[in-house]
């Protein structure tokens, strides 16, 4: 089996271009994290910027601590969703690149 360095370089360049595109898409992707069965929702982008918070009006009569807990849980849910989305995207991209034998992405 011959090792073609030129082919490998072309594939690396193509992968670099895919990576840049994926990073741009990931930064612009948005997810909604939820808590309290959807009573608190947090919208977050791929840069982990919180773009919006939606709190059901029924929670306004609840105590401050409950609302704080639900808000923290919704933010954490959004972070997990963004990270999962980015991880899945990376795995899909890496699946198209021929890694050398014994190397796992």
Curated annotation (Swiss-Prot):
What does the protein in this record do?
Answer: Binds to DNA and alters its conformation. May be involved in regulation of gene expression, nucleoid organization and DNA protection.
| GO MF entries | DNA binding
The main location is cytoplasm
The family database entries (InterPro entries) matched by this protein are listed as:
YbaB-like_sf, YbaB/EbfC
Q: What is this protein called?
A: Nucleoid-associated protein ABO_1774
Q: Which domain of life is it from?
A: Bacteria
| Compartment annotation | Cytoplasm, Nucleoid
């Amino acid at each position: 089996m011959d090792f073609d360095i030129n082919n490998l370089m072309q594939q690396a360049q193509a992968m670099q271009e895919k990576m840049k595109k994926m990073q741009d898409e990931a930064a612009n992707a948005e997810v909604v994290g939820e808590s309290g069965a959807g009573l608190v929702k947090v919208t977050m982008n791929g840069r982990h910027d919180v773009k919006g918070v939606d709190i059901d009006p029924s929670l306004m009569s609840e105590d401050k601590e409950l609302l704080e807990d639900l808000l923290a849980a919704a933010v954490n849910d959004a972070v997990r969703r963004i990270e999962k989305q980015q991880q899945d995207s990376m795995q899909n991209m890496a699946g198209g690149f021929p890694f050398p034998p014994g190397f796992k992405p």
